[in-house]
Each structure stands twice: as C-alpha cells, then as structure tokens.
C-alpha cells in the first residue's frame, strides 16, 4: 500500500466521522424496505424537490434520467469540438443558480478565467468572442454585470489543477465538506495515483474511472465526468453513432 492510498483512507475515515456515518455491514432486507418506502414518501411530500436528483435544466433529459442522483457516476462522451464543456457548464450553472446547489468543477483543460468567461457569457447571453476581444456594447456590459452579480451569489467552485488524481480530488472535496455535484473536464487528462499502471493508459483510465465511481458512492454525490471519444466512429460505414468502444 502506497502513501497516497494510506492518506486517502485516513482522510475518508475522518470525513465519515464528521458526517456521523455509521459503517454498517450486512443489513436485513426488511430494514432496507422501510428506508425505501420512507424515501418514496418524501418524494411525494410538498418539499419533495430536495429529495430528487439535481436537475440538468434540460427537461427531456431530466424526465428520462430523473436528474443527477446521489452516488451516480455519469460519463459524458463526445468527440473533440462537440461542446462537452459548454454542456457541462450549463448543467453546473443551472444546478447552482436555479436549484441552489453547491457545484465543484475540476477543469484539466481550461483555466479558471476561461471557465468564468463561459459562465458569464451564457448567463448574460453575450457571445464568447466579445468577451475575448473586449468589444462590448453598453447593454452587453449591463447584462454582464448583472450576470456577474447572479453568479457571485452561487456556490460554484473552480479548480484548474493539471493532471489531478482521484485521491487529490477527494481530498479537496472533503475540505469543502458540503458539495452536491462534481464535474470533471475531462477524464483522459487525469493522472493515475497508482504508479504500477504507468505506461499502460488503458489500465490507468480504467483505474481512474473506477476511482471516480467509488468516490461518488463514498461522498454520496453525483459525479459527472467528460470523456473524449475516438474518431473511429466517423470511419465506420453506415452508422456513425458513438459506441462504448469509442471511449479512449
């Protein structure tokens, strides 16, 4: 067992103690049934929204997946340049602004200022090019200031640490204590905490993915990870729709 694993285990135990988590073993089915019916009862109560998944802001998607639910690990795959980051930031913005959730965004590709500009652009309905050039009309300045005021009141946290590992993300989230949604952009830029896998990228990605799924369950939150898809699907005859095998 390496030092990173020991540190991660120790931090997890401290985190569990702070939350008063009772580490149970086997649990009889009748107890789980009672808990399940209790959850269903809460879902039908007047304040049911707090027990439902975090809304993405896309009605059709929310109706299909019932929002982003606790312990879910969601892998969002698309080819380069298809708008993965914009899509994920829209989810983050909606969760923070409309649902008043705490959102942590780990960006391994873009810096914090770039992410902030994108969030402001979307909230203010001002083109991203104008934010890059600074050539803004007076009404656009007004909308940007209003957007900045709205976003400043949210609990969106940005981290642009390059080549971050799963244990490092977990450590930062534990220090944050209260977090409702984690977004990672993107999976292939993360580093493995296990040196034994160095040089074997397939094993590294597999270990990182498994670690993120475990993290979602341990912290009891949804984790949305973006992933690049290989361009091989474009070369396939007939159906160009991406498949699981296109995850690289």
Regions found by a protein language model. Give the residues of each.
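The Walker A (P-loop) glycine that initiates the GxxxxGKT/S ATP-binding motif of P-loop NTPases
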Residues: 78
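Short hydrophobic/aromatic beta-strand immediately N-terminal to the Walker A/P-loop
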Residues: 74-75, 104
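Phosphate-binding/switch region of NTP-binding enzymes
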Residues: 203-248
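Walker A (P-loop) phosphate-binding loop of P-loop NTPases
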Residues: 81
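Flexible beta-alpha connector loops of hexameric P-loop NTPases
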Residues: 50, 128-138, 156-162, 192-206, ...
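Conserved lysine of the Walker
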Residues: 84
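Core recognition of P-loop NTPase motor domains used across DNA-transaction enzymes
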Residues: 1-70, 126, 140-155, 167, ...
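Cytosolic-facing regulatory segments adjacent to core modules
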Residues: 63, 94-178, 192
